[in-house]
């Protein structure tokens, strides 16, 4: 009887050790799976971000298009510099305050197409520009900083209809003609001017 009890104790010990080893292997395997998932998420982050940027381009461009059209109508009159005092605090931020596309914080308008949306990173700024030989304030300009390359060239293509001048990273993608008539826009040129990442600056100007 004693021998049987001893055998049972040995068996129980072996079973306990086996369960412990199985539990250890399970934890190791679980940790490995979690690490693998983390790596896959890190690898796919740019693609995920690019997807969200692409889905926002259309709505963002449409809102800016409406804003520029409305602002141009307000600028019609006898003044040769109707946009001399245009700025974010008085014009852009109030117009976008209830936007579901942009994020407004005070006078800062984040476009959410790249960048942090803080300060001048990933934001939209409006200001007076000189167009067609006119003085400063004869036109208005919208500047979008830190735009992701996935927004190229869709953003510029949509805003082409309300812009007389478009530049991408400091290089003109559309300019006025020799007689100040609207110039031509090439989407391929705009695409070629873009660089990878949240490193693109767009300027759209009109009168």
State what each model feature region is:
Residues 1, 42-45, 68, 96, ...:
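Detector for methionine-enriched segments
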Residues 1-3, 22, 34, 69, ...:
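N-terminal functional modules and adjacent low-complexity/disordered segments of proteins
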Residues 2-63:
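N-terminal single-pass transmembrane signal-anchor helix
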Residues 14, 19-21, 56, 66, ...:
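Arginine residue identity/basic-tract feature
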Residues 37, 55, 60-64, 69, ...:
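Generic alpha-helix signal with a bias toward terminal, lower-confidence helices
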Residues 49-96:
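Membrane-proximal N-terminal amphipathic helix
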Residues 80-207:
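Periplasmic/extracellular, small/polar-rich flexible segments of pilin-like filament-forming proteins
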